[in-house]
Amino acid sequence: MQTVHTRAALAAALDPWRRAGERIALVPTMGNLHAGHLALVRRARAEADRVVATIFVNPLQFDRPEDLAAYPRTLEADAAALAGAGVDLLFAPAEQEVYPRGRDGVTRVEVPGLGDELEGAHRPGHFIGVATVVCKLFAMTRPDVAVFGEKDFQQLLIIRTMNADLDLGVRVLSEPTVREPDGLAMSSRNGYLGPEDRARAPALHAALRALAGALERGERDFPALEQAARSQIEAAGLRPEYVSLRRRQDLDLPGPGDRELVILAAAWCGPARLIDNLPVDLPPSG
């Protein structure tokens, strides 16, 4: 695996692959990798001739400077994991390389509506930062395919919408959430959990499963089911921010005829803010 740190070196590495007509897949990350990231690499490996991974802790998507400063930087271990998973090229730029005019002056990309609620309401500006950096990474690498995880479901839809609206031409694929044996969604932020909080954390996924089970049994009072899930999360010692049942295709509120839904939730577990989601297919009525 080759590692490059500048846009010029990235372009030089990509050029012969493009001239040879090879398909290129992109896996963007912020590092501090876990098994979920490596699942994205495996999918990319199956979809393309060459796999490019990026590691960039994007300052535009952090709400608080202290969170940006505290985010783990584990480049050496991450590079070894990516090489072992079959990545051909790692792009690990400094902030100045991605935002040469500085983060304050950069042109920003916004997906209105979809980026304003749920995670967007609790983390103002977060999705503008995500869309901006992904748009720049797409422009710098010009991949045929990019792979993202479904754990960040709202982010996935925002990236797909941006890609379509701006005619970027990238095939955006997704991989299911990878979980610990007790159901906790794998996340770089799980490292913030102490032993007691780690023991409580699976309650978030358990509440989503309970809500999904109620839907599959035919219950349809969505607000009451959401409140029951919030109460279950609180009873486990977590602090829920939201539990919301949405239409899977666009995160609109579901109507009577909608069957492909997703439950989205966020909760604080000690110092860690956890997010999770669970797709649900309602049985046909009648």
From Swiss-Prot:
GO cellular component: cytosol
Gene3D superfamilies reported in the protein's UniProt record: HUPs (3.40.50.620), Pantoate-beta-alanine ligase, C-terminal domain (3.30.1300.10)
Transmembrane regions: none
Entry-linked Pfam families: Pantoate_ligase
Reaction(s) catalysed (UniProt annotation): (R)-pantoate + beta-alanine + ATP = (R)-pantothenate + AMP + diphosphate + H(+)
Gene Ontology annotations of biological process type: pantothenate biosynthetic process
InterPro entries per record: Cyt_trans-like (IPR004821), Pantoate_ligase (IPR003721), Pantoate_ligase_C (IPR042176), Rossmann-like_a/b/a_fold (IPR014729)
Name of the top EC class for this enzyme: ligase
Positions of the catalytic residues: H37 (proton donor)
UniProt: (R)-pantoate binding residues: Q61, Q155
Binding-site residues for beta-alanine, renumbered to this chain: Q61
Pathway: Cofactor biosynthesis; (R)-pantothenate biosynthesis; (R)-pantothenate from (R)-pantoate and beta-alanine: step 1/1
E.C. number(s) listed in UniProt: 6.3.2.1
One GO MF term attached to the UniProt entry: pantoate-beta-alanine ligase activity
Primary localization: cytoplasm
Binding site for ATP: 30-37, 149-152, 178, 186-189
Keywords: ATP-binding, Cytoplasm, Ligase, Nucleotide-binding, Pantothenate biosynthesis
Compartments, as annotated in UniProt: Cytoplasm
Quaternary structure note: Homodimer.
Family: Belongs to the pantothenate synthetase family.
Functional summary from the UniProt entry: Catalyzes the condensation of pantoate with beta-alanine in an ATP-dependent reaction via a pantoyl-adenylate intermediate.
Additional free-text comment from the UniProt record: The reaction proceeds by a bi uni uni bi ping pong mechanism.
Protein name as catalogued: Pantothenate synthetase
Species name: Thioalkalivibrio sulfidiphilus (strain HL-EbGR7)
